[in-house]
């Protein structure tokens, strides 16, 4: 799901981690189409935090429904996945990236099912970025669309860890434009992938 620089990041275990969320409707829209979830799961494996942000697509019907539905479905899958880990050995073998992708795929299916039953919501979708952080300092990230993950540290400052699925990112990847042109590009809001828009 993520084509970014590195989906697995080590955060030193002695460092303090802060998890939080804030959402603001902004000055353009009347409805906040964002939905955020922070889960803390504990078991035989220790403790993991699962973070998810879904940004309903502006201008599309029921973007706020898509983001809420996606986050709810992803969280259900993730809780179920970790509840099956009864011993630490199974946790060590758990592929966090596939756990995240499984949640995203389920969210995609649920949004498509919702739109098939509610034609007025046709075309609704959401972008998403999610991460699993375990108590050993392992961080795994997945994203769809242009929702981003950043790591902030004293050593490296603020570093973007995901790559957008967008028209402008495609131009950057082909070296057709530079970073400055990307920031001001007239098509910078066109995304190429989203949760809930196609079966794949």
Feature locations, PLM:
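PP2C/PPM-type serine/threonine phosphatase catalytic domain
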Residues: 1-200
